């Protein structure tokens, strides 16, 4: 892709499947950076369908080893989230905006359909092995991870593997 070797994969659903795939990419393919993309559900009311969130921090919203440690804290690591490098997040935001703005036909079709151009945010993600299908579940995650803009089932596991193997993640 533009002179850079790229490995594209589908990890399957869930944290374990995503972690397995990330580990394979790092160990077998010797990737130097992982660009994670996927589908997420909005936790923040300002997000609309089609908006893009480039992650700053990843939380496992279903991590709960209380009373041994606080909710969200990853056992033996003493932390509750995994962060991207700020410059990688910013580069990701800029790339997504450039990509969206480059497709004039797509933007025209959105306008004709009465839809707005997707907004791009840098923010926090919450991941867990739960499909969030109710307001009650959504509110529970928002309560436990108030900074999270959206929720998925894989990204925090990939972030943990990337940190374990010192592989940058965007």
Regions inferred by a protein language model and the residue ranges of each:
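N-terminal short beta-loop-beta anion/metal-coordinating cradle
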Residues: 1-29
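A short, Lys/Arg-enriched amphipathic alpha-helix followed by its capping loop at the start of a domain
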Residues: 1-4, 161, 165
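Active-site nucleophile and cofactor-binding loops and adjacent substrate-binding regions
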Residues: 11, 149-153
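Short loop/turn motifs at secondary-structure junctions
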Residues: 30, 48, 121, 166-168
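Structural motif
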Residues: 33-35
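Mid-sequence, gly/pro-rich, charge-dense loop/helix-turn segments that line enzyme active sites
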Residues: 43-150
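Zn-dependent metallopeptidase/amidohydrolase metal-coordination segment
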Residues: 156, 162-170
